[in-house]
């Protein structure tokens, strides 16, 4: 899909490459994509090189952040291949409050889980500062 790498979650578009695509053609819905979605996807794919640096930065930042927090005792963080880190904490309410203090929003799930989207280096450093303070305060 184009959602993660190109920041186009709202257009709901993906593509497929392969040798046997013709066999799938009978399964396709006619006019499955709006002309707006097709135009956006076409423009983005024509400029794919411009997105490569952004993707490399996201991967690098994701790995940097994961390496720092993976050994924290108050968090369980999971390896990721996406543009976010997924974690759990039994003290999630406190963690969320600490993020709120710094005007940082993370995805909150009903159980002890949360998700942190990878941002710019500066944004990620702010997130790491909160995670460090959380770990230190609860150790």
Regions found by a protein language model. Give the residues of each.
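A short acidic, often aromatic-flanked loop/helix-cap motif at beta-alpha or helix-coil junctions
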Residues: 4-6, 86, 115
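PLP-dependent enzyme catalytic core of the Aspartate aminotransferase-like
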Residues: 97-102, 107, 111-139
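PLP-dependent aminotransferase class I/II
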Residues: 1-71, 76-77
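Conserved PLP-binding catalytic core of the aspartate aminotransferase-like
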Residues: 59-63, 67-102, 118-120
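Short acidic/glycine-enriched loop/turn segments that link adjacent beta-strands
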Residues: 10, 81, 110-113
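Asparagine-centered polar/low-complexity signal
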Residues: 32-34, 83, 124
């Amino acid at each position: 899909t184009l959602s993660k790498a190109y920041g186009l979650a709202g257009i709901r578009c993906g593509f497929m490459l392969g040798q046997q695509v013709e066999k799938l053609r009978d399964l396709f819905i006619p006019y499955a994509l709006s002309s707006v979605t097709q135009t956006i996807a076409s423009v983005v794919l024509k400029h794919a090189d411009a997105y490569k640096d952004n993707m490399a930065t996201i991967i690098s930042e994701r790995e940097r952040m994961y390496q720092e927090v993976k050994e924290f005792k108050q968090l369980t963080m999971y390896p990721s291949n996406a543009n976010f880190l997924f974690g759990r904490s039994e003290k999630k309410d406190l963690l969320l409050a600490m993020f709120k203090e710094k005007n940082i929003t993370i995805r909150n799930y009903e159980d002890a889980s949360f998700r942190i989207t990878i941002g710019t280096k500066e944004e990620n450093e702010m997130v790491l500062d909160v995670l460090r303070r959380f770990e230190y305060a609860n150790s």
